[in-house]
Amino acid sequence: SERPKRVFNIYWNVPTFMCHQYGLYFDEVTNFNIKHNSKDDFQGDKISIFYDPGEFPALLPLKEGNYKIRNGGVPQEGNITIHLQRFIENLDKTYPNRNFNGIGVIDFERWRPIFRQNWGNMMIHKKFSIDLVRNEHPFWDKKMIELEASKRFEKYARLFMEETLKLAKKTRKQADWGYYGYPYCFNMSPNNLVPDCDATAMLENDKMSWLFNNQNVLLPSVYIRHELTPDQRVGLVQGRVKEAVRISNNLKHSPKVLSYWWYVYQDDTNTFLTETDVKKTFQEIAINGGDGIIIWGSSSDVNSLSKCKRLREYLLTVLGPITVNVTETVN
C-alpha cells in the first residue's frame, strides 16, 4: 500500500530553554520552517519527550558492576499497576495539558522487548532472567532455561510497553505517540558495516506489530558517528529510514516516520556535523519516504554560555538555511 503524502515537518527537540539564563534565545528557530514549542519549552505544545517515565522494571547500574533492582528488575517480575500509576503522574507533572496534540515521545532505553536484542549494557536483564529460571529449575538444560527465560521476558516486556502506550493515548488522545528508537535496524554496527538492517532484526520487527500498530508515529534514531566514512554515514540513515517506512507501509494506519537526528557526531559530541553531512542526511531521510525530522539535543550541549553561543551560531549559519531548503524542496 502507498503511504499517504504528508507535509514534511522538522521539529526542534533541544533543551535550549537552558540558554535563557545567559540571555540567549532561540526565537529564530521558527523562521527556518522548524516546529518549535512556544516559549522554547522542552516539554511543549509541538513535541514532548518523556525520559524513562513511570517505573518500568529495570536493573539500574551502580558502581563496581552492582545494580539496583527497580520494580522487580525485569518485566516478568514487575508490578504493572505501580508503573502505570507513576507513568500518568510523570506525564501530568511534566506536561499536564490533556489536550496536547503534538508528538509524544516515550524514551525508554533500559531493555528491549526482544530478548535477543538485549546486548551491551542491557545484557544484565537477560542474565537476570536466565538466573531466575535456573533457580526454579536447576535440572533443566541450558537451552530449555534460556528458552523459558526468553518467553517470560518477552511476554511481560510486551505487556509493559503496550499498556504504557495505550494509557498515553487514552489520556492524551490528540497526540501522536511513539517509542524513541523503534524500529531498530542495527546497521552500520561493527559486525554489520552495511546500509541494510540486520536480517534477524527485520524479522523481529515484523513480530513487533503489536507495538507499531499502537504507535501513530515511528521514531527511528539516525545519530551518526564520526568514525564512519561520509558514505557510511549516509548509508546508516538510508537503512534506518527505509526499515521504518517498510514497517509503516505494512500497517493499515501507515504511521508517520519521523527520524531522530542529532547535530553533533555521537562519538564526538564537541563537533557539529559538517554542512555536507547535514544536507546529505536530511536528503536521505526525505528521499527514502520519511515524513520529517526531529532535531534532538542533549542538556550537556547547552549547559554553558559558550556552548549556547556556538549552537545558536550553527543554527543561524548552517542548520537553519538547510532546513528551509529541505522543507521547501520536499513540500
UniProtKB/Swiss-Prot annotation:
InterPro entries: Aldolase_TIM (IPR013785), Glycoside_hydrolase_SF (IPR017853), Hyaluronidase (IPR018155), Venom_Hyaluronidase (IPR001329). GO terms for biological process: carbohydrate metabolic process; defense response; hyaluronan catabolic process. It is found in: Secreted. Glycans are attached at residues 79, 325. One of its GO terms (molecular function) is hyalurononglucosaminidase activity. One of its GO terms (cellular component) is extracellular region. Keywords: Allergen, Disulfide bond, Glycoprotein, Glycosidase, Hydrolase, Secreted. Expressed by the venom gland. Pfam families: Glyco_hydro_56. Gene3D superfamilies: Aldolase class I. It catalyses: Random hydrolysis of (1->4)-linkages between N-acetyl-beta-D-glucosamine and D-glucuronate residues in hyaluronate. Its EC number is 3.2.1.35. Disulfide bonds join 19-308, 185-197. The active site is at 109 (proton donor). Its main location: secreted. PANTHER family: HYALURONIDASE (PTHR11769:SF35). Hydrolyzes high molecular weight hyaluronic acid to produce small oligosaccharides. Belongs to the glycosyl hydrolase 56 family. This is Hyaluronidase.
